[in-house]
């Protein structure tokens, strides 16, 4: 029954600076990045690694991640930025793609590690636990904004948005934002526990890619937001990429295990 479902009255726009709107999503993106920075620097200290290499990695990861996240969002949401010049400035504070940010960061870091001759697997394992921590916090912004919303449902834990510029109003929906949040939190906890006894350099990175792509592909089944591309009216691009990623991860995992043994 509807009375048992969660009513979500959100605050998407926190305040404005002139014509620039500061969105709650942008604030939680910032908080997520700050948490990732603190987590990564703490891990650097624990491993007694080079601080300045860590700073290079952080700056590259954040800049490439933000660029990738923004480009992916704009690519799939061009109509959102055709109202006038002020919407270009609002790009800074709203509209991001988690998958785009992940791909942008990974690509930039692979190039950096090869150029510097660093052990990419080792450094990625140092960095990777901070990524799902950031994503967990960022998903709070998704929930407040109403983006990444789910399909209609009458399950007891459905949520109903009463104020949103993105999600349908007055309709009980799957809380897919909360699904993502919980999944990312579990991934973070697993990596945090596993990092002290990983079997080989790169295991944490491969585990993250595996679990992230699986949770994203599964939760995509329950999502209804339009910011996704469908292939053959059957699967989303994320599900296709996720399937390929799982195959690649399994191959790399077996290869790394043979190298260690």
What is the predicted role of each segment?
Residues 17, 73-87, 145-160, 218-239:
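Interfacial helix-loop-helix junctions of multi-pass membrane proteins
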Residues 20-36, 89-108, 168-189, 236-246:
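Membrane-interface loop-to-helix entry segments
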Residues 42-46, 117, 196-198, 252-261:
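Membrane-interface capping segments at transmembrane-helix boundaries
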């Amino acid at each position: 029954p509807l009375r048992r479902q969660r009513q979500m009255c959100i605050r998407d726009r926190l305040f404005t600076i002139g014509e620039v709107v500061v969105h709650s999503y942008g604030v939680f993106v910032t908080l997520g990045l700050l948490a990732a920075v603190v987590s990564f620097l703490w891990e650097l200290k624990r491993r007694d690694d080079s601080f300045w290499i860590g700073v290079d990695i952080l700056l590259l990861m954040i800049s490439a991640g933000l660029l990738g996240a923004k480009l992916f969002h704009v690519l799939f949401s061009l109509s959102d930025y055709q109202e006038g010049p002020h919407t270009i400035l609002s790009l800074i504070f709203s509209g991001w793609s988690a998958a785009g940010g992940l791909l942008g960061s990974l690509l930039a870091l692979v190039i950096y590690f090869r150029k510097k001759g660093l052990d990419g697997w080792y450094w990625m394992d140092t960095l990777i636990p901070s990524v799902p921590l950031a994503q967990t916090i960022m998903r709070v912004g998704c929930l407040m904004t109403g983006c990444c919303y789910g399909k209609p449902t009458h399950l007891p834990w459905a949520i109903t948005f009463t104020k949103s510029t993105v999600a349908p109003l007055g309709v009980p929906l799957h809380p897919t934002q909360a699904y993502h949040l919980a999944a990312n939190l579990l991934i973070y906890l697993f990596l945090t526990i596993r990092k002290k006894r990983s079997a080989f350099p790169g295991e944490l990175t491969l585990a993250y890619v595996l679990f992230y792509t699986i949770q994203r592909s599964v939760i995509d089944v329950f999502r209804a937001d339009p910011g996704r591309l469908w292939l053959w009216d059957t699967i989303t691009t994320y599900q296709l990429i996720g399937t390929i990623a799982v195959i690649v991860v399994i191959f790399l995992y077996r290869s790394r295990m043979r190298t260690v043994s």
